[in-house]
């Protein structure tokens, strides 16, 4: 089963009949319009390409305009692709709604995390701080040693150091689907998802469900 592209609207909470409060993220999933269907013969793999939302006409490039026109769909805010299994049939111009999640219990949500700029090792990697006193005057939040000696004579790749934090692709797995509101194109999932309000999200059935 493919996933869908939505937009993060924010968080709220809903109550069960027992009065238990459930924190939920509200994801708006407008109809995903199929722009291209890929197959083994022409592309070497099976996939469906979709778009959603809208884009100002003066922001659409000529190649994009031709691509959307060929599929007979309105220009969207981006293009996304989902692999399809043998037997799953889609056609260009088809609309796929949030209702496909009606029977799904858990989903994986992918988004771009909030960028937090340049951060030190304590904030970025949860390094412990060094002594506040006991003779330590200047090295409270420094990372400490970053290597060994003449052997190996280099800093290993992947060493955790200060740098840019956030603004990267993150996936949160196995979030419970709390409600599917097909009338308002909303999907409510339990817990938090990556990214800022208004950010694009990719929602797929959970791989570990």
UniProtKB/Swiss-Prot annotation:
- One GO CC annotation, please? cytosolic large ribosomal subunit
InterPro entries found in the cross-reference section: Ribosomal_uL3 (IPR000597), Ribosomal_uL3_bac/org-type (IPR019927), Ribosomal_uL3_CS (IPR019926), Transl_B-barrel_sf (IPR009000)
Q: Name one GO molecular function term.
A: structural constituent of ribosome
Q: What does this protein do?
A: One of the primary rRNA binding proteins, it binds directly near the 3'-end of the 23S rRNA, where it nucleates assembly of the 50S subunit.
Q: How does it assemble?
A: Part of the 50S ribosomal subunit. Forms a cluster with proteins L14 and L19.
What is the organism field in this record? Serratia proteamaculans (strain 568)
User: Pfam family example for this protein?
Assistant: Ribosomal_L3
Which SUPFAM superfamilies does this entry report, sorted A to Z? Answer: Translation proteins
So which domain of life are we looking at? Answer: Bacteria
Protein name stated in the entry: Large ribosomal subunit protein uL3
Task: List the gene name.
Answer: rplC
């Amino acid at each position: 089963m493919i996933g869908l592209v939505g937009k993060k609207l924010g968080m709220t909470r809903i109550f069960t009949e027992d009065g238990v409060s459930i924190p939920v993220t509200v994801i708006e999933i407008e109809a995903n319009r199929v722009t291209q269907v890929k197959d083994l013969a022409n592309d070497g793999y099976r996939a469906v390409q979709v778009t959603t939302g809208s884009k100002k006409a003066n922001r659409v490039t000529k190649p994009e305009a031709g691509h959307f026109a060929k599929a007979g769909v309105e220009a969207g805010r981006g293009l996304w692709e989902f692999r399809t299994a043998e037997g799953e049939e889609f056609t260009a111009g088809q609309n796929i709604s949030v209702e496909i999640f009606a029977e799904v219990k858990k989903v994986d949500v992918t988004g771009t995390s909030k960028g937090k700029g340049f951060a030190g090792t304590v904030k970025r990697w949860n390094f412990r701080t060094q002594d506040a006193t006991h003779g330590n005057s200047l090295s409270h939040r420094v990372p400490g040693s970053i290597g060994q000696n003449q052997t190996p004579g280099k800093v290993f790749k992947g060493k955790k150091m200060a740098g840019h934090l956030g603004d990267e692709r993150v996936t949160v797995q196995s979030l419970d689907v709390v409600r599917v509101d097909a009338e308002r194109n909303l999907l409510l999932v339990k817990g938090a998802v990556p990214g800022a309000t208004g950010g694009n999200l990719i929602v797929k059935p959970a791989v570990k469900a």
